[in-house]
Amino acid sequence: ANCIVLCNEEGSHRVGARYLTAATGMTMQQVKKNPSRARDLYAPIKDKIKIKDATGRDMSWVESVCKSYKPDVLLLDMGDKFARSQGFARADEALKANAIHARQIAKQHECAVFYMSQLSADAEGKVLLNQSMMEGSRTGKAAEADLMILIAKNPPKQDDGDVEDLQRHLNIVKNKLTGWHGVITCELNYKLGRYES
């Protein structure tokens, strides 16, 4: 599948480094020590994934990118930051319109759209999450999704000190694809940018 990642929160070089480590199974230190091995491992997908900086861009620009590149998969990292608030009385209305535009792009360009978003403060310290815990939205963003995966981590414990708990909980809170809802518990492998069981 041809994929394009439009990132507007972190620099595209940092996002690209995470995709490299996830795809190769090599940490950045290993990549630096053995770049030829990393290049060989990344080669099968190198031409199938494009990562572009999208800072300050809107959904019209996203649509023009889809017309040019014709991706099978489009990742909006972060989807909410493509929204424009002009002409809307409330921020949630702008986010809903943004999600509707993303869905229209998926239909028109026959591609899967992954719309990444933040969780609200309501999700802090909780393992079991629901649709209402997405940042800045009432029901608008959720209504446009076919599948929603919300990622939680364990609440901090007093005696943990500086030890980072890497357990994560993938909450499937909406699923029009198969109908299954539930929680999958896994570990964050931050050195590789992967969620692993």
Describe the residue ranges of each PLM region.
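Helical mechanochemical/support elements of P-loop NTPase systems and associated helical scaffolds
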Residues: 11-15, 37, 58-61, 91-101, ...
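Short, glycine/acidic-enriched loop or turn micro-motifs at the edges of active sites
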Residues: 12, 80, 121
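C-terminal regions of RecA-like/P-loop NTPase motor modules
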Residues: 43, 59-74, 104-109, 121-197
